[in-house]
Amino acid sequence: MAAAVVDPQQSVVMRVANLPLVSSTYDLVSSAYVSTKDQYPYLRSVCEMAEKGVKTVTSAAMTSALPIIQKLEPQIAVANTYACKGLDRMEERLPILNQPTSEIVASARGAVTGAKDVVTTTMAGAKDSVASTVSGVVDKTKGAVTGSVERTKSVVNGSINTVLGMVQFMNSGVDNAITKSELLVDQYFPLTQEELEMEAKKVEGFDMVQKPSNYERLESLSTKLCSRAYHQALSRVKEAKQKSQETISQLHSTVHLIEFARKNMHSANQKIQGAQDKLYVSWVEWKRSIGYDDTDESHCVEHIESRTLAIARNLTQQLQTTCQTVLVNAQGLPQNIQDQAKHLGVMAGDIYSVFRNAASFKEVSDGVLTSSKGQLQKMKESLDEVMDYFVNNTPLNWLVGPFYPQSTEVNKASLKVQQSEVKAQ
């Protein structure tokens, strides 16, 4: 079989090598390579050795590959034909392959210069457009910011005025509340003697005093309230002590009169009459002390006895109420004070039980009267001791309300009950 002959002019390798772009590029690279070897002697020797090595390797490879190439020559011819056809199509589509490198570089430079001019013109126009746009935006933003600042300023001023109005309203409300509180304190806690003297000095001197602030008024009101409450509680303790002493003294006198009447019941008529007169005077004085001044009453012995026993019951009831109040307020105090308060309540209950159901002097024995007088003396001493401890050793914040509760009303109610009992007898 005859071998296929390949036209060297149609070899795809030769066609590629003869392309202007490839050949011109090869010339440029070759000239650069030669120039480099000439400029650098050491590099030239290395390059020459490398060239010799490449030639030797290439020669050996061609010698060993030649039999294979000869066997594959038909296939190579077919592949070369198809490659040449593909190269033809590439040359049609890419005219740049038939242009030398110098022309391509010149065209590229022209394109770059034109692009540069276009870009410069575009950038200048864009710069002007951006500058104009930015200027317009700045003007609009400035106008918007100015309007916003004015609106914000107006809103802030309105808010400040509203807050100031609320502060003024609250200040007025606080001032009114403090004024009412001061009036209530003056009403329920009157001025003490020291404060009255200070007020008198202020009036005499005509000192012009600047109106204090609300904080100062609140502090003054708190101090005034504590001070006046303390003095009022102290005066109530002293008043309770005085009333309890008077009650014990009256009860002691009543017991003594009952004892005197019992001992002289069977003596001479003048002694009986004297005892009755004393009892009657005691009855009238006691009624006047609680607000009654009715002297148009019977003066007989039975009425005198019942009235005297009514006095004793009322006085013992008052004393018992006082002792119960003392016992309640003694909670939390030292144990000896609490024990004394409890003992006071027990003794008051014993004395009250003596006169509670007695209808005449005969029902009250001499021994009971003597024992009652001894208990009254002990109660007076113990009550004085407990009251002195309250005044001198404890804060008076435990005193709330009247310490000696509504004695006048209790006396009047008791008197009405006792008068109804006398009328029934």
Curated annotation (Swiss-Prot):
Any keyword Phosphoprotein?
yes
Any one GO cellular component localisation term in the record = lipid droplet
Keywords annotated in UniProt: Acetylation, Lipid droplet, Membrane, Phosphoprotein, Ubl conjugation
Q: Which residues carry this modification: N-acetylalanine?
A: 2
Its localization reads: Membrane; Lipid droplet
Record PTM text: Acylated; primarily with C14, C16 and C18 fatty acids. Phosphorylation at Tyr-230 by isoform 1 of CHKA (CHKalpha2) promotes dissociation from lipid droplets: dissociation is followed by recruitment of autophagosome machinery to lipid droplets and subsequent lipid droplet lipolysis.
Gene Ontology BP term (one): lipid storage
Q: Which residues carry this modification: Phosphotyrosine?
A: 230
Q: Per its UniProt record, what InterPro entries does this chain match?
A: Perilipin
Disulfide connectivity for this sequence is: none
Gene3D superfamilies given in the database record: Flagellar protein FliS, Perilipin, alpha-beta domain
**Pfam families named in the record:** Perilipin (PF03036)
> Which domain of life does the protein's organism represent?
Eukaryota
* Residue ranges of coiled coil: none
Which purpose does this protein serve, as stated in its record? Structural component of lipid droplets, which is required for the formation and maintenance of lipid storage droplets.
How the protein assembles, per its UniProt entry?
A: Interacts with IRGC.
- Say which family it is in: Belongs to the perilipin family.
Official protein name in the record: Perilipin-2
Origin organism is Mus musculus
